[in-house]
Structure formats: structure tokens, C-alpha cells
């Protein structure tokens, strides 16, 4: 990392959020097609963005740039190296962002031109089902996978002293992680989620993920404001 980033060992690695080569849809489009040409149009181009207040407009621009997939990361997503105040207070919940993006792309008639992948606070199979029903084509996980592998959520990934040997290069710590055991735990997690998702879908009378995608009639809100329900496109529980 020190060599690649040209940062002296022991120094803070400051990674600013802005991409100073992207200030418009045209700039993004140029980058997207540069990547497509470099990969001979054989690899999908994914643009990942944080869930923020104007995410619907941002996603619309990404879809028009020619990207194949939009990955949306809800607040509380990210690495264990992120400052706690930033992780817990910056951004908006993935549910609101996802619903807003799906509705915007459908209204503009470009929903089928791009896939939506959701992440950030996806902690269980029920979170996956809710995300799919709100418009996601798929979900991705980070922290949930790490926990399955043995992560204790110490939130000190940047220190190089991960006591489970996951986020470190120190030989005395990496030897604590058994890759085969970690692999088995992760496989168990995903297989359990798969079974639970099937059970939840069966309870809703749905027999395929495709039939669940964007099917908000399957969802109801509890303890949500009228504005939140409007953005999510769902009814109060009991309605």
C-alpha cells in the first residue's frame, strides 16, 4: 500500500471522496466507455455511490452514462476503519435511497437499462428480501461476511492489529485465521440465507426473485412517517 500510494509507512492515508476527473455525466460517460474498451466490452462496469439526499438524481445520471450496474451503499456501510461519527451519521438508510432510485428510473423509463445492487446495513436474509422488494436486483455484503469469518467488530481495521487475523498482514496475527474454517462459515451463512429467503418468499406466495423485485405491495411500514412511506411506496401496516 505504501509503495502503490506513494505514502511513507506509518503516515495517515487520506482518501478524499471527490473524483476530480468527474464533474458531469459526460465525464463519467467517458470513463465508463474507456473501461469498457479496455476490457473489450466483456466486463460489466459498476459505479458505486453512497446513499445521499440526492441519490435519485445521481443514479439517473449514472444510468445515462452507460454504466451497467449502480451499486448503492447505505449509511452504516463501509469499513471498520471509518470514523464512528461518519459511519453512523453520514448518508441515508439504504431502504429510502433504493426506493427513491428505483422510482426515479422507472418514471424516466430507463430502469431496464441498468441493474441496481444494494449494500450497507444488509445484515440478514430479511434485509435482502426488503431490499429486493424495494427495487434492488441484487445485494452485496461486507460486514456480515466478515462476522461469519470471525470478525469481532473491533473497528480497528486501520491499525493492522486485527486480533482475528483478517485485516492485518502481521504473521503472528494472520496465523490465527484458518482460511478453510472461515470459508466454511461463510458458506453456511449464505446457504442459511438462501433457505430463509425461500421461506420468506413462500410465505408471500412468490416463487422467484424476479417476481419479488420492486414488488412493494409485499411490504408494510411500522412506525414510519407519511413522508417515509411515500418515498418507500408502501402502506401502513394493516392497510
Question: Over which residues does each language-model region extend?
Answer:
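Short, flexible segments with low predicted structural confidence
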Residues: 7, 33-34, 183-184
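Short capping/connector residues at structural and topological boundaries
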Residues: 6-9, 19, 24, 162, ...
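Hydrophobic alpha-helical context, especially transmembrane and signal-peptide helices
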Residues: 1, 122, 196-199
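Hydrophobic alpha-helical segments, principally membrane-spanning helices and signal/leader peptides
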Residues: 9, 143, 190-193
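ATP-dependent carboxylate/acyl-activation modules
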Residues: 1-14
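Glycine-rich phosphate/ribose-binding loops and adjacent secondary-structure elements
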Residues: 14, 19-174
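C-terminal extensions of enzymes
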Residues: 179-239
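Glycine-centered secondary-structure boundary/capping sites
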Residues: 10, 55, 61, 91-92, ...
Amino acid at each position: 500500500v505504501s509503495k502503490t500510494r506513494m505514502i511513507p509507512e506509518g503516515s495517515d492515508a487520506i482518501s478524499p471522496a471527490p473524483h476530480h476527473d468527474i464533474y458531469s455525466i459526460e465525464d463519467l460517460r467517458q470513463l465508463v466507455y474507456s473501461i469498457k474498451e479496455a476490457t473489450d466490452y466483456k466486463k460489466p462496469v459498476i459505479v458505486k455511490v453512497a446513499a445521499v439526499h440526492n441519490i435519485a438524481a445521481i443514479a439517473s445520471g449514472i444510468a445515462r452514462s452507460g454504466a451497467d450496474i449502480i451499486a448503492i451503499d447505505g449509511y452504516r456501510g463501509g469499513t471498520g476503519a471509518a470514523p464512528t461519527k461518519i459511519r453512523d451519521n453520514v448518508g441515508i438508510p439504504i431502504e429510502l435511497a433504493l426506493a427513491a432510485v428505483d422510482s426515479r428510473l422507472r418514471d424516466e423509463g430507463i430502469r431496464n437499462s441498468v441493474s441496481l445492487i444494494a449494500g450497507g446495513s444488509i445484515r440478514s436474509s430479511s434485509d435482502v428480501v426488503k431490499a429486493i422488494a424495494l427495487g434492488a436486483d441484487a445485494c452485496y455484503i461486507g460486514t456480515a461476511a466478515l462476522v461469519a469469518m470471525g470478525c469481532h467488530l473491533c473497528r480497528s481495521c486501520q491499525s493492522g492489529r486485527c486480533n482475528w487475523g483478517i485485516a492485518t498482514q502481521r504473521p503472528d496475527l494472520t496465523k490465527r485465521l484458518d482460511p478453510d474454517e472461515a470459508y466454511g462459515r461463510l458458506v453456511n451463512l449464505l446457504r442459511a440465507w438462501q433457505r430463509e429467503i425461500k421461506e420468506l418468499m413462500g410465505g408471500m406466495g412468490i416463487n422467484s426473485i424476479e417476481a419479488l423485485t420492486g414488488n412493494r405491495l409485499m411490504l408494510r411500514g411500522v412506525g414510519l412517517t407519511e413522508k417515509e412511506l411515500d418515498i418507500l411506496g408502501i402502506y401502513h401496516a394493516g392497510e
